[in-house]
């Protein structure tokens, strides 16, 4: 599960499911994170500030689904005394397509991981693209 320190990060179109976790996304120490269109199922602390009383951080969360979650779903800024605030990260410097959050469990469990030998008649947004037939793949 991602933890961000000293930078900007973007988590989108992810499926988080782990009933024994401490957190799904942790943001701390001069970090700013954009959390978009993810599906959180059976997790504690879907997104949380890691050191809210010691260092500034920022979380922007939008379009996510929280299914049987508990704990922190922190958003906004945390700025302890004596520190400047961290700017929100809301405009990644690249283009991307957001899937509907309710479709994420299906898309991730169906299209993530080793799928090179499977026949597909549809291409999901963000699905891996096969550029060579499986027969010609290098085998180790």
Which sequence ranges carry the predicted segments?
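Extracellular beta-rich repeat passengers
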Residues: 3-6, 10-140
